[in-house]
């Protein structure tokens, strides 16, 4: 019986690609676990009672994040229209507007998604009357495309391709809270809520992990 001798191609694969595929699979598993933990915290916090601004300000960040919060104040004219947001196969914007509270704090509020065919641009430049809103107190992560430079126009509303804390706080010149209020669908001035606490579900990462591990075993 001839002794099996792997060819050069198989040797190269085993030495170089097999470990890489295992690392990629393990990375996706870790990402899935991270996303699962985020969803679990979000679901638990969301199940708690709604709290007001004074209560939220008295908490540390881990206690406050993802809690439902009730705020009183008014929307300003400062609105960002985050471009390239497709929902149900339709192009639109995700709308972010400054909300100034009765406690003299400024928050950026994600009012949800709206079709480009349905948004009234002129109406977005008006400051609202005093109102109360409810939403999820969420981390201020980057929204949109990851660009090296953010091009921001000089008039409101501003159409942007990306939005993060540094861009918004510099552009607004405000002592902005490092959170975004994810406006509830029942609140005044809300559009279609599409926000999720994590961009992908854990199952998606676990699915990718299975694919990488499968390739390693082929």
Where are these predicted regions, by residue range?
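Surface-exposed, charge/polar-rich loops and edge strands
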Residues: 1-57, 64-218
């Amino acid at each position: 019986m001839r002794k099996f001798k792997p060819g050069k191609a198989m040797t190269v694969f085993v030495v170089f690609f097999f470990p890489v595929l295992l690392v990629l699979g393990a990375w996706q598993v870790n990402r899935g676990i991270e996303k699962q933990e985020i969803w679990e915290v979000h679901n638990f916090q969301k199940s708690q009672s709604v709290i007001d601004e004074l209560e939220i300000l008295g908490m540390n960040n881990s206690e406050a994040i993802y809690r439902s919060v009730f705020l009183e104040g008014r929307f300003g004219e400062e609105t960002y229209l985050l471009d390239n947001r497709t929902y149900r196969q339709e192009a639109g914007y995700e709308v972010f507007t400054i909300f100034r509270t009765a406690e003299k704090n400024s928050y950026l509020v994600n009012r949800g998604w709206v079709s480009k065919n349905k948004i009234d641009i002129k109406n977005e430049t008006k400051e609202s009357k005093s109102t109360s809103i409810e939403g999820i107190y969420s981390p201020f992560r980057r929204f949109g495309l990851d660009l090296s430079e953010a091009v921001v126009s000089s008039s409101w509303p501003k159409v942007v391709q990306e939005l993060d804390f540094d861009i918004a706080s510099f552009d607004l010149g405000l002592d902005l809270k490092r959170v975004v209020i994810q406006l509830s669908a029942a609140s005044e001035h809300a559009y279609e809520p599409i926000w999720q606490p994590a961009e992908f579900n854990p199952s998606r990462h676990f699915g990718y992990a299975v694919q990488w591990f499968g390739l390693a075993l082929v």
